[in-house]
Amino acid sequence: MTVGYGRELLDLIVAGTPSGETPVRHICDIPARNAEVAVWPQWVHRDAITAFAAQGVTDPWSHQVAAASLAFAGRHVVVATGTASGKSVAYQLPILTALAAEPRARALYLAPTKALGHDQLRSIRELITGIDSFDRVLPCAYDGDSSNELRRFARESSRWIFTNPDMMHVSLLHNHTRWSAFLRGLRYLVVDECHYYRGVFGSNVALVLQRLLRLCARYGSHPTVVFASATTSNPGAAAHALIGQPVEEVIADGSPHGMRTVALWEPPLLPITGENGAPVRRPVSTEASRLLADLVQEGARTLTFVRSRRGAEMTALGAAHRLAEVDPALASQVAAYRAGYLPEDRRALEQALSTGTLTGAATTNALELGVDIAGLDAVVVAGFPGTVASFWQQAGRSGRRGQGSLVVLVARDDPLDTYLVHHPGALLDKPIEAVVIDPTNPHVLRPHLLCAATELPLTEDDVRSLDAADVVAQLVDDGLLRKRPGGYFAAPGLNPYAAVDIRGSIGGQVMILEADTGRVLGTVDSGRAPATVHPGAVYLHSGETYLVDSLDFGDGIALVHNATPDYSTFARSTIDIAITGEGERIDLGDIQIGLVPVSYTH
């Protein structure tokens, strides 16, 4: 395979288009980049160097050493470099050195998804297995999939815990006295994929992190925070907003990558018209299925990113059908990966993707984050993912080091995607967006203040650092906080933890059960259940088709049975917005702009 392998793959899929179609609107080649290597710092424990050498890492890259050295010196740092640039080494070096040298030292790793946390845990176990200096590290997962026995082991024995913001909030912070030994020895806190923490989710995570650091100070530890981020605008400021403390940034990427070919692809018009006679293009899911099938048939390891769980299932199913027409054995080389699968099913798919047992997968943004899937040849992005940062994060999953790769953005039939493929500079030359959070939002801050006061009375310094004086005063007026000489105390009997909705989710989980066997297929958020598992709905799961028999919100169960209907179902959404008052209005030529009250019916 040559440096121009991405171009070869593009020529292949273009050759597979029907005669007369010219879907490629723009092609851009991103040049290859050579590695910038560094030497191992003198402070790194010799067994850590041995461990990395056994994994084939003989010379670290410059950004890894720069970030690791800042962390070892006790300075909070964010390393913001490209996908697959080895950011994990930047925190593994100081952590392993501390764990080997200090028996009481502890480390905490925080990931936004369980898949990423388990992937990093697997990587660490492979790295340190068989090395005596690390035999008492006992790295362990602590998340919603962990059994009670494993949770107790993590709390009492593990020196490096892999968790997520949700578990940190509901368990570690809530029951911090049971974690006192761990918190007292906490030397390093890793916040991986920190660019993911934006909006309300990021604001909640910021307050969780600041509550953690507040408790650590109470127990006498002052952990160094190491952030790992995709390339973003002003990563140091974003990391500062998460913990409320200054953060150094390392942004010069020393990792190598091969030439990457980016193609902007517009599906052709169909000989039909839509609403009001509007032209209609071939659906993005159909186009993405064909591209995935063509690439897998060529042997190119491919990820196709889609916008929805149903889209992942449909794209994988469509690709499998196309491949089966060529060679039935190829159909098993593609699968869907999405949220809602059982933990063991997710782990099996991750392993198959990592080892190459699966050649292609259709996925939601669940695989946008840094799960280690090395050696991908191509990425198909089925529809603009909403931000430039997400596009480059998904695109960055492609490319073996030193070899070319292909990225194809397939435009959906909507104005934004159409504009982007016809104006490539609006995507390819646009700066990556800044991460925006607001931990001082009173609706977010209020329940966190109650949790913090439950954990440890709030001092005046705490109130000032959180910019929370007005919210605290309101909580005192409401009788939820009580002011005493020692600070602000939570009212007796108060349990505010359930009021914190970290991810802005919509209700609990509905289990999807096969009626004939009782087998659990997966789960769906109760807010999504009426649209996806209503009675009579066609439900897709891992390439199998089911019909929904019943949906019971009381028990949180949807019953389904295996079937092969010759139709599919989807939810229709009707929205009615009506202006109900005069408000403020101005005329701009033929257009009127107004700030007016409305009624919203959905």
Residue ranges and their predicted role:
Residues 113-117, 292-322:
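Conserved strand-helix element at the start of the C-terminal RecA-like helicase core
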Residues 404-407, 413-428, 445-460, 474, ...:
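Extended Lys/Arg-rich polyanion-binding regions
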Residues 97-117, 220-221:
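Conserved SF1/SF2 helicase motif Ia
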Residues 236, 240-241, 248-305:
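Conserved interdomain linker/interface between the two RecA-like ATPase lobes of SF2 helicase motors
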